[in-house]
Amino acid sequence: MNVIDHVRDMAAAGLHSNVRLLSSLLLTMSNNNPELFSPPQKYQLLVYHADSLFHDKEYRNAVSKYTMALQQKKALSKTSKVRPSTGNSASTPQSQCLPSEIEVKYKMAECYTMLKQDKDAIAILDGIPSRQRTPKINMMLANLYKKAGQERPSVTSYKEVLRQCPLALDAILGLLSLSVKGAEVASMTMNVIQTVPNLDWLSVWIKAYAFVHTGDNSRAISTICSLEKKSLLRDNVDLLGSLADLYFRAGDNKNSVLKFEQAQMLDPYLIKGMDVYGYLLAREGRLEDVENLGCRLFNISDQHAEPWVVSGCHSFYSKRYSRALYLGAKAIQLNSNSVQALLLKGAALRNMGRVQEAIIHFREAIRLAPCRLDCYEGLIECYLASNSIREAMVMANNVYKTLGANAQTLTLLATVCLEDPVTQEKAKTLLDKALTQRPDYIKAVVKKAELLSREQKYEDGIALLRNALANQSDCVLHRILGDFLVAVNEYQEAMDQYSIALSLDPNDQKSLEGMQKMEKEESPTDATQEEDVDDMEGSGEEGDLEGSDSEAAQWADQEQWFGMQ
């Protein structure tokens, strides 16, 4: 047993730090005396040393050593062709123990992906002949092609994975996301479904996620619910997470939160989807719950985007936009495909007046998730903020045609129509259609109430809001109802509605302002005193604003490493 055998055994045992130290010393010895180790032995040393560097996350250094190893292997191959084997018995086991050249190239590709050099990763894997590609190589290639927008080679690679491993479910999802028909994907798994027991659910699973990737949320929800109700798949965390995400996409935030909570109870260490859950909690004004969720996720892992997004949502809804921007950028650094991180950063940029930069982020979110309406909503809000009503109208019409005429797309189109006096009647028609489909859809109710307020039809608005609040409780709806009640001189009930709104979201400034305005009108003698107090407090508020400006500058200094500009 020679020293190379000892290095190999330590590598196999996972003693990476020991391998790194010993292989470094042995490589130096080899450089000083080239005759000390044979070419195959030096190749092995370089590979084992590179593997130890990879384990220590020194990816650039590892790539350098892997490259040297491949050069050594190339020279070794040329030598073996020129000089045939002499029959030396010692060389036979040595050649059998040589690390696979294909595995070395795969490790190099992994390094390149960690360094965000996807083109180099594709180039190194493309150099491997198709017949020699293992399933993991095809899977990595498929994901890299998909990320680069090269759909055809991505589909080919995913299909090759399924040919070798017909139960590779992530490869199935990859194909469905690239618009491959569910029936075609299912046909690739038919043999294994028929031969392996207890896999009768797989065809339904494929059907469900085919609906997901075509944006048919209602059929996707019903199909996954039918799966989840089966005794063998009941309480599956992945299915519950998918259901929660689908309810969110469909605008049913209440059921989305319930499913996320159910999944979280089953798996306290769940990270996937928690960014959306945190966003929903923040929207409801449950900032303390958001803060607790963020802390818990950071304790699980700070190397995922989700905890950073959750903390960013807490900052955003606390009106600390510069910090939300920083946290969103950090999340993008960790996962450039995080749609929620892109939306967070885009929203922060928009609220800071950097609309053109925000537009870039929302467009990237749309590219990654073309079936998610909230991505389009963010982009349209940017267009409206910059008075680009024509662009907003074109985008809203495209969404309406692409995702179909449902309550959400009708409301989005109506929102843009409300911005133009010429299209007010069209907005009214669209909102009526949306509310016919879903009378409880909050965004449609809010926009219809806004239209009724413009027309001063307060009684109609009150009836609309009471009907919407019959089966749900929402801060914004209670606040708007309070505003309408003030308009018809129902002050006591208006005060009650503002109080309910503030109990749901203590940070809702508009409800607080409505309540304070009523109190001033009821007590005119105290008004001047309150104004004096406000003036005295004003200096303190100015100090806070200055502090937030300095904080903005502090976070802005760090934009040099932000995920996307």
UniProtKB/Swiss-Prot annotation:
Pfam families: TPR_16, TPR_8
Primary subcellular site in the record, as a coarse category: cytoplasm
Chain positions found as N6-acetyllysine: K229
Keyword Zinc attached: no
GO molecular function annotation: enzyme-substrate adaptor activity; protein phosphatase binding
GTP-binding is among the record's keywords: no
Outcome, altering L26K: Loss of homodimerization
Ranges: TPR repeats: 101-134, 169-202, 203-236, 237-270, 339-372, 373-406, 407-441, 442-474, 475-508, 509-531
Protein name from the UniProt record: Anaphase-promoting complex subunit 7
Gene source species: Homo sapiens (Human)
